[in-house]
Amino acid sequence: MKIRPFLLILFFLLNCVGCNLRPDVRKLPCSVSKIKETISNTQNNKKTLRYDKSVRRTKMKKSRYISLMEKILSAYTNEHITQYYNEVKANGLKEHGYPRLTANIGILIAHGKRTDLKEQFVQMMDLCCQEIPLHKNAANEFSIKEVIFALLELEKHQTFPREQIERWKGALKNVTVENCYRVYATAPDSQVYNWAAFAMVSEWMRYHIKVAEPDFKFINNQAASQWQFVDVNGMYRDPHEPMIYDMVTRGLFAVLFHFGYRGEYFERWDAALKRAGLLTLKMLSVTGEVPFGGRSNQFLHNESHAALIMEYEAARYARLGDMKMASSFKGSVDRALDNIELWLRQQPITHVKNSFPRSTRYGCEKYAYFDKYMITAASFLYVAYLFCDETIPVGELDDVTGATWQSSDHFHKLFLRAGNYFAEYDYRADYNYDASGLGRLHRKGAPGTIALAIPATDQPKYAVNADETTAFSITPEFFHNGQWLSGAAREAKHQVKSHRAQKNSASAEISCSWPGNARVETAYFLSEKGLQITVKANSKAGLMLPAFAFDGKIRPEISNDGKRLSIKYQNWVCSYVLVNGIIRDTGKTGYNRNGHYKLFRAENDRELTVEISITPQP
């Protein structure tokens, strides 16, 4: 519709008059030249009146985070909370799960949720503030910032009398770096890892609420010590490069900056956050999941870290005036939260992505127990709540156009995206947790585990319910000297030779070799039809095909006729169709964090092609 110039002139004149009548409103320009310029811009550049087509008008409310936090807390019964309190009261504070639980209860009470716990919360907070200054081996590096987050919310909402808040703050004045923190940098080149970043943020939060005098040397030492572990992409290298701890540490610096740090190391770290933030968009799956790889993976808190990073970057780009990019980050936030909500609908709620009883600790490291890691998801969702800008629309994400990205060799990952599918390849896995090969194949809307969400090692550092385990991924195999060699084996070497993206597809060529000059070449082609894999060898070629067999509660339906291997699970079907050769059951079972997988093999002389698809069940 054509906009009449005299209507725009009238609009500007009325606004100018309104500005003169309202001294609280900044005056709008109302010169004739400005009016003509505006009319010209309106008629000749109509895009200024519209959102980008990739941006939805849907806004995400901050209250969504509070609702998710409340749902997470519901995994703890009142009896469980009381028991936890009594244990800490009797035995002293020994870890940070209890302060995290306390802080999140306080935040929810401040928002009018779980007020039934108000009296018990006072006892819990009293115990936290009493115990924290007494210990240096209770992971105070993690806890203090979270206790302060709760105090800020309680103070803001006037949930308790000021005297009560000041009493809790007063207890935190007794904290000293030397007596209360165990791991921190004493010099810029100290060889300490992410605990130093946690200590940095906890101390900064003490400065923020004025219970400690600012010590910028301490803060700068922590920031400098962590910088030595940043790769060329701005990603943080914790020991053995676990994917989630890259996000954890970046998130801690985002908190530091959100609360005002602009010291010596701000610019370099902020640039790293910006650079890695863009790459995080490439690593997040179509299911909303963070990349697999290394320790602490496949827990619900993983996507909490992704959400806070995406919220931080969304706000950054909104400030820069790039609403398209800001909305893309918001779209990724929305997707990560959808993934958390999916798992929170499961009963009973678990902190790890499987359905095994909590008591088994299936899929968990020794340190990753329920009491600590369930509430951790809420802790970092609260940080995302702090960063959330409700005015940014949630953007539509493009999962159809082909895209590829390869990390630095420190993280040894290749990512493919096309046709609503997503694939992740680990070409030099950490065998404490993973195996090399294609460790993830997802389709948007489908369960992440139906094909594969993570690979598995033969000697996992997390609990499984089997004495003997087999390393597996979707990986090439080779028949050599009378035996099958697996690309998931520790001795296998994978090399990414090339990868490329086209309009609606993504592809890669990867070689796999073993000692003794055994070698295969494998081509991967991802499109709306799924993933096509072609293996070429100078002898019999194979491809390992994991079939999801048990999630801790449900046993998917598996069928194999030699040409088609199908897995039916949660109203979806994963199909492996062999173009040439035969699919055999190896008789082996593999165990990853998500559950059990029966291992099949596609076989053929010299060359084979398998087409993998994930489709709704008819």
Give residue ranges: language-model regions.
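Extended ligand-binding groove/face enriched in aromatic
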Residues: 79-221
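Extended polysaccharide-engagement surfaces of secreted carbohydrate-active enzymes
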Residues: 282-575, 581-586
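Extracellular polysaccharide-recognition and catalytic grooves
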Residues: 138, 144-150, 170-404
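Mature N-terminal, pre-catalytic/accessory segment of carbohydrate-active enzymes
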Residues: 19-96, 100-101, 602-604, 615-618
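Beta-strand-rich recognition/accessory modules
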Residues: 540, 577-618
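Charge-rich, solvent-exposed alpha-helical interaction surfaces
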Residues: 38, 68-75, 120-127, 167, ...
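Classical Sec-dependent N-terminal signal peptides that target proteins to the secretory pathway
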Residues: 2-22
